[in-house]
From Swiss-Prot:
InterPro entries found in the cross-reference section: Kinase-like_dom_sf, NAF/FISL_domain, NAF_dom, Prot_kinase_dom, Protein_kinase_ATP_BS, Ser/Thr_kinase_AS
Annotated catalysed reactions: L-seryl-[protein] + ATP = O-phospho-L-seryl-[protein] + ADP + H(+); L-threonyl-[protein] + ATP = O-phospho-L-threonyl-[protein] + ADP + H(+)
Species assigned in the record: Oryza sativa subsp. japonica (Rice)
Gene: CIPK26
Active site residues according to the UniProt entry: 134
Region feature Disordered, mapped onto this chain: 311-332, 465-493
Protein EC: 2.7.11.1
Protein's job: CIPK serine-threonine protein kinases interact with CBL proteins. Binding of a CBL protein to the regulatory NAF domain of CIPK protein lead to the activation of the kinase in a calcium-dependent manner.
Keywords of the record: ATP-binding, Kinase, Manganese, Nucleotide-binding, Serine/threonine-protein kinase, Transferase
UniProt similarity note: Belongs to the protein kinase superfamily. CAMK Ser/Thr protein kinase family. SNF1 subfamily.
Any single GO BP term: signal transduction
Protein name: CBL-interacting protein kinase 26
Length: 493
């Protein structure tokens, strides 16, 4: 029997893997001093730096240190070695709320209790100027007492991220839960967008399926834009009324959290014991400042400057640790490959999926997109290879964007194009090329004669125009976007 233990920083014993994403793995762990169970998210510095996501990691740390609430998953500490960043998180023994829903819908009493906790946590976030922007059942965890914990703040925004118009402008989130104003690519109020997502979650809790769904993604987005959905007959009148006010396509008239708390359905008493009960339809259509310190950031994120003795950060204070890496008790370094940030912007990307024409006049675009089944690392490797081949200079930008610059000036100066990778599913990505400077004809020629042929071995389908393969593209996306997803519509019979 193998008695070796994996010990991290002389502080935590690492156990089984709990989850995995593109850039991180999450492990169950135990504090060696207190015996407390925790979850440790292990992130590879080099990988996230290479794809321009370090700013997102920093933001997630800042936000999680800013929000302390019983219904928010707690970040206990951040540690670092030369090559890795470790988030020590509260362990949610009950797992994802999504897994519970996938076994069957909840009664309104059970759903109400979870919804109370969700609204409480989100209301607190908003009071601190934090907007989650990726609320969905997969990001809602349960502890051993069935208490809800909002997690995964990788796409969250702080109020200071707003532009001069007071609105956020980054398209984030998971399509089925995203508010219409976010899909429109216009500025939006982060609080109002979160409220919409809470409404979709509430519908899912009580029905067991998504309110806005269609085998055709464009049609699904049209339904979201018009807030067109159907409630089962089993829904109470009070619940239907609340959903109608939350799923209001106009954010200016959408119900606020204080009014949600005063609604008849919300104020009904929830039987705590209802959570122990079993999960249990013509339809009506409704339209309806505690951030990471400078010292911490320097040491954690600038791995090349780290000393041979790693620093452990607890509540912003740095202490030293003699254990530079995660190692086994026999002295050998544990092999922990790390590719989870919780998705990039995954909507309104290709011509076929773009909803902007539902909201505004469409103008000529200078963008080309393709889908691929290759992992992110392979995509970026291919883009770097392509740049070397055609002597394009690479300028890295934030959030997984590479700027490619032509070696010589053209008719309208240097031709520049941005290549951005979006994750649609763990093994399904969309890559967008967008001209940011230079002559359009030169850009189109470069794409047609050089870039497209060079990418043919990783392209699954080009999106939009004559290159698109509509049925294959749409069906492939639909099939892989939400694996083991909730039922898409009300069961028959």
């Amino acid at each position: 029997m193998d008695d070796r233990r994996t010990i991290l920083m002389d502080r935590y014993e690492i156990g089984r893997q709990l989850g995995q994403g593109n850039f991180a793995k999450v492990y169950y762990a135990r504090n060696l001093t207190s015996g407390q169970a925790v979850a440790i998210k292990m992130i590879d510095k080099e990988k996230v730096t290479r794809v321009g996501l370090m700013v997102q990691i920093k933001r997630e740390i800042s936000i999680m240190r800013l929000v302390k609430h019983p219904n928010i998953l707690q970040l206990f500490e951040v540690m670092a070695s030369k090559s890795k960043i470790y988030f020590v998180l509260e362990y949610a023994k009950g797992g994802e709320l999504f897994k519970k829903i996938s076994k069957g819908k909840f009664s309104e009493d059970v759903a109400r209790r979870y919804f109370h906790q969700l609204i409480s946590g989100i209301d607190y976030c908003h009071s601190r100027g934090v907007y989650h922007r990726d609320l969905k059942p997969e990001n809602l965890l349960l502890d051993e007492n069935e208490s809800l914990k909002v997690s995964d703040f990788g796409l969250s925004a702080l109020s200071e991220s707003k532009r001069h118009d007071g609105l956020l402008h980054t398209t984030c989130g998971t399509p089925a839960y995203v508010a219409p104003e976010v899909l429109s690519r216009r500025g939006y109020d982060g609080a109002k967008a979160d409220i919409w997502s809470c409404g979709v979650i509430l519908f899912v809790l009580v029905s067991g399926y998504l309110p806005f769904h269609d085998t055709n993604l464009i049609e699904m987005y049209r339904k979201i834009a018009k807030a067109e959905y159907k409630c089962p007959r089993s829904f109470s009148a009070e619940l239907k009324d609340l959903l109608y006010k939350i799923l209001d396509p106009d954010p200016s008239t959408r119900i606020s959290i204080p009014k949600i708390k005063r609604s008849a359905w919300y104020r009904k008493s929830s039987d705590v014991n209802a959570l122990k009960s079993k999960h249990e339809t013509g339809d009506k259509v409704y339209k309806g400042e505690a951030t990471t310190s400078d010292t911490t950031e320097c040491s954690i994120f600038e791995g090349n400057r780290a000393s041979s003795r790693d620093k452990v950060y607890t509540n912003g204070e740095a202490t030293t640790s003699d254990s530079p890496e995660c190692s086994n008790s026999d002295g050998k370094q544990a092999s922990l490959s790390l590719p989870n940030l919780n998705a990039f912007d995954i909507i309104s990307l290709s011509t076929g999926f773009d909803l902007s024409n539902l909201f505004e006049e469409r103008y000529g675009r200078r963008e080309e997109r393709f889908t691929t089944r290759q992992p992110a690392a392979a995509i970026f490797a291919k883009l770097n290879e392509l740049a070397r081949r055609f002597k394009l200079k690479i300028k890295k930008k934030e959030n997984g964007v590479l700027r490619l610059v032509a070696p010589k000036e053209g008719i309208k100066g240097l031709l520049e194009l941005d290549a951005e990778v979006f994750e649609l599913a763990p093994s399904f990505h969309l890559v967008e090329f967008k001209k940011s400077n230079g002559d359009t004809i030169e850009y189109q020629k470069l794409m047609k004669e050089d870039i497209r042929p060079a990418l043919k071995d990783i392209v699954w389908a080009w999106q939009g125009g004559q290159h698109q393969q509509p049925e294959q593209s749409m069906q492939g996306m639909q099939g892989e976007q939400q694996p083991s997803r909730l039922p898409s519509q009300q069961p028959q019979g």
